[in-house]
Regions:
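ATP-dependent carboxylate/phosphate-activation module, predominantly the ATP-grasp catalytic core
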Residues: 233, 241-296, 301, 324-347
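Glycine-rich phosphate-binding loop of ATP-grasp-fold ATP-dependent ligases
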Residues: 186-215, 236-238, 260-278, 331
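A long amphipathic alpha-helix within ATP-dependent nucleotide-binding catalytic cores
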Residues: 222, 267-315, 360-382
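Short, charged, surface-exposed secondary-structure boundary motifs
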Residues: 64-68, 143-151, 198-199, 216, ...
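ATP-binding N-terminal substructure of ATP-dependent carboxylate-amine bond-forming enzymes
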Residues: 1-143, 171-174, 439-456, 460, ...
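A conserved helix-loop-beta module that forms one wall/lid of the active-site cleft
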Residues: 132-203, 209
Length: 466
């Protein structure tokens, strides 16, 4: 099914709402999420549908309205000082899955009868939190798909076009890179020795032999094996799907804001947005590839829920680079514009409480995703940041402060599980429809560096080559 042949069936919102109300009604819940403000709408949804009591465990407050429920803050954050997204995510996950006496006591006071259900984050593989069952927990065989070393085998099984890659020991990575390098070099990604990872934290762009020593040193500390592939020039992008019991729903493509450092080798993951549109033939090719991968996941391990295929739209078309077997940023963008509680729906699908028709889900998300755009910048830094914001607009020379009536984005900072975060929320109806917003992300981050003395390196956006 490509974008031209989607059945425009209407998703049954009333049945979804009734089913989720039956899940939440009369039940105590413990929600564990690293950023409290990110759970506000979900917790409000649970309470509105009859949850008896809800407790939140979070690392930090975040930006925006906070949930009006009892909240315990772990205050965990990454310990490496490198602002890696995974540092903060893992620190928080460890805090809730191996709770301190203090946290366990707080949970036991909230739920003395040990009858609450728990909700964990998308990376978590926990099946319980302080003895409470995690509703919609990830199965071990699904978690195993987080291994970046198996990507090529999945692409082959799905029968989709992909770039060459090889998996080698760190000691053999330099040799493999020499054999695979293009004029722009190679890209290396680590295995899961230190656990699951995402957000580009364990990826390095090795442009030439001059970069190899630093790369070998870094991977030697953090990995046993690496996957080496040629550097792919073009727009970093992703295509997301959702596996139900009756099929696979595929969403529309979106742009991954993977920026490039200009002072040295390296990528910077800075969020995602769906303002960009690939050519129609590439859009259909991306969606067909995601559908094929979703079918492999369902047939091999009985996968259910969201997944994403990251890649690059090169001059030769879309080439995948990695699989993300979980709900991620792209799902969140489309769920927001469609006004559907996708995280709650996904957990209920996994638990067997909710049946979703893949064709209806796909039609809803593609139609809404095409009609309403969203997304923005999420740039992590090691230094804790104060809560502040400013309206900006974009001129030829970069981003400048704007009056409210002229704003094209809101630039903000806040505390995060990594230390601090810089946020850029684009005003959707003032963004160039169909074009990459990565250059605007670069301009906004450059303004934050200059105006607030934030240690953001010089960055540039990937070029469109298709």
């Amino acid at each position: 099914m490509d974008s031209a042949t989607i059945d425009r069936a209407t998703i049954d919102r009333a049945t979804i709402d009734k089913t989720l109300a039956n899940v939440y009604r009369g039940q105590k819940w413990i929600v564990a999420t690293d950023v409290a403000a990110g759970a506000t709408s979900a917790i409000r949804y649970m309470i509105d549908r009859g949850a008896s009591e809800v407790m939140l465990v979070a690392a930090v407050e975040g930006v925006g309205e906070l949930p009006d429920v009892p909240t315990h803050y772990t205050r965990t954050q990454g310990t490496t000082g490198m602002a890696r997204v995974m540092d903060g995510v893992r620190a928080f996950d460890a805090a809730v899955t191996r709770p301190s006496r203090t946290l366990r006591a707080v949970i036991d006071r909230f739920d003395p009868e040990n009858e609450a259900l728990a909700i964990a984050g998308p990376f978590s593989v926990a099946t319980e939190i302080a003895g409470r069952h995690v509703y919609g927990a990830k199965r071990p065989e699904w978690a195993a798909l987080e291994d970046k070393m198996i990507a090529e085998e999945l692409w082959e099984a799905a029968g989709i076009n992909h770039a060459p890659a090889t998996v080698v020991s760190v000691a053999d990575a330099a040799r493999a890179a020499v054999e695979m390098a293009t004029l722009e070099g190679t890209v290396w990604v680590a295995d899961n020795r230190e656990g699951w990872h995402g957000g580009g934290d364990y990826v390095r762009w090795v442009r030439s032999v001059n970069d190899m020593a630093d790369a070998l040193d870094w991977f030697g500390v953090h990995a046993d094996r690496v996957r080496v592939m040629p550097f792919l020039e073009g727009i970093p992008c992703s295509i997301h799907g959702f596996v139900t019991r009756d099929g696979v729903a595929v969403l529309r493509p979106l742009e991954m804001l993977v920026l490039r450092r200009t002072d040295r080798t390296g990528f910077v993951y800075a969020g995602a947005a769906n303002h960009w549109d690939p050519p129609d033939l590439d859009r259909d090719a991306m969606r067909n590839a995601a559908r094929a991968v979703g079918n492999v996941l369902r047939d091999r391990v009985g996968y259910l829920g969201g997944y994403g295929v990251d890649g690059v739209l090169t001059e030769d078309g879309f080439l995948p680079t990695e699989l993300n077997p979980r709900l991620s940023t792209g799902h969140g963008i489309v769920a927001h514009v469609a006004d559907l509680p996708l995280e709650a729906m996904a957990r209920a699908v996994v638990e067997g409480s909710l049946d979703l028709a893949a064709a209806e889900l796909e039609a809803e998300f593609v139609e809404r995703g095409d009609a309403v755009r969203g997304g923005g910048v999420r740039y992590s830094i090691a230094k804790v940041q104060p809560d502040r914001s400013v309206d900006i607009c974009f001129e030829e020379g970069g981003a400048v402060v704007a009056e409210e009536e002229n704003r094209e984005a809101v630039l903000a900072t806040a505390r995060s599980p990594q230390g601090g975060i810089v946020l850029v929320n684009f005003v959707a109806d003032r963004m160039p429809r169909g074009r990459s917003v990565a250059p605007l992300a670069v301009a906004a981050l450059s303004h934050a560096r200059a105006a607030w003395s934030i240690p953001i390196p010089p960055l540039e956006a990937a070029p469109e080559v298709r």
